[in-house]
Amino acid sequence: MSNVRYISNLTRETYALILAGGRGSRLHELTDWRAKPALYFGGKFRIIDFPLSNCINSGIRRVGVVTQYKSHSLIRHVMRGWGHFKKELGESVEILPASQRYSENWYQGTADAVFQNIDIIRHELPKYVMVLSGDHVYRMDYAGLLAAHAESGADMTVSCLEVPIAEAAGSFGVMEVDEEMRILGFEEKPQQPKHSPGNPEMCLASMGNYVFNTEFLFDQLKKDALNESSDRDFGKDIIPAIIEKHNVFAYPFKSAFPNEQAYWRDVGTLDSFWQANMELLSPTPALNLYDAKWPIWTFQEQLPPAKFVFDDDDRRGMALDSIVSGGCIISGATVRRSVLFNEVRVCSYSLVEDSVVLPDVVVLRHCKIKNAILDRGCIIPEGMVIGYNHDHDRAKGFRVSEKGVTLVTRDMLGLPVGYE
């Protein structure tokens, strides 16, 4: 019981800041009208729901969401889905756009995004500040990270995981540690990452999740703000500057529950986004969205149940090995191994396979679609074939990924744009 109380005290003394202003440029047109944290995932969620749910499930009830790029849909989603917290009980989820309080600039980097909100953080009087990436899909008990930080006497703790060197090159901050997990070296997105101890194929990559002692964080941010050559970034500037003279430790990422494999996905490319959604269709997926022990919270629209209509031999409405969300109608069509978000309509004689279909999409009659991502609000013309011939897809103006996933957006179809 004392350990439970200890963890509870730590989480109550923590303010979490989720950095949710990223564009996600490797997702191409999929993030033309929304920030990456606002991107849909898993049939009904948005990416921002995962770090927010981790906070709530970990007992952290004071959260700020830092926004910048194309933030309208993100702000609207957080206000609708996360506005039920009670300030009188010490709970809050606040939206923190760039205030330009200390300069006329927007957020210049991850460290600057925190620096511009120092006054708001100070008002909360936290003992610890947790800085979290808002654009990854994962389950993590932040209480364990906090406990490790407090017990080690660290000034800063960096959450990390092992990543193949080829995958990490140019994409992740990479660290070197000693046997006590003290960070000895840190490089931001090196082209030739240094391997983990005893494992030449893997390296220790930063997850972009940090815990700081509050006053230590403030001191380092103020120093960085005076450095004219700084990029105002934790990975590029803050961490390399402090590892020699201060206690900076790594915390290995682990599952929220014993004997379960830890789950973390970057979903930063079209292929990884498609693959992570497809993984959810497994009978026992690595990310179990149905696990009541660690629920993923989100904004719940009031929609009717999904409906499957017609049962003729050549016109049967059915979905197999798929996720089909509220408001969907499968009308005499077949859906296989696909994720359908809310209010999707698939009309008679059409076939949708191995695809991710975002909200409000209409697939008209006699279409054949496979290995595709259909962006929100697309209306697929009658008889259109997508995903069967990549040259034909490109000729229609669609984007084909490195691994053969076809992205279709409203703009590519000649429809008015602006869906978020």
Swiss-Prot record:
Q: Which family does it belong to?
A: Belongs to the bacterial/plant glucose-1-phosphate adenylyltransferase family.
- Kindly give the SUPFAM superfamilies that the UniProt entry links to this protein: Nucleotide-diphospho-sugar transferases, Trimeric LpxA-like enzymes
Task: Write down the chemical reaction(s) this protein catalyses.
Answer: alpha-D-glucose 1-phosphate + ATP + H(+) = ADP-alpha-D-glucose + diphosphate
Which species expresses this protein natively?
Answer: Shewanella baltica (strain OS185)
Name of the gene encoding the protein in the UniProt record: glgC
Gene3D superfamilies the UniProt entry points to = Hexapeptide repeat proteins (2.160.10.10), Spore Coat Polysaccharide Biosynthesis Protein SpsA, Chain A (3.90.550.10)
Q: Which UniProt keywords apply?
A: ATP-binding, Carbohydrate metabolism, Glycogen biosynthesis, Glycogen metabolism, Nucleotide-binding, Nucleotidyltransferase, Transferase
Q: Where does alpha-D-glucose 1-phosphate bind?
A: 107, 173, 188-189, 206
Name of this protein: Glucose-1-phosphate adenylyltransferase
Q: Which GO terms describe its biological process?
A: glycogen biosynthetic process
Which pathway is this protein engaged in? Answer: Glycan biosynthesis; glycogen biosynthesis
Q: How does it assemble?
A: Homotetramer.
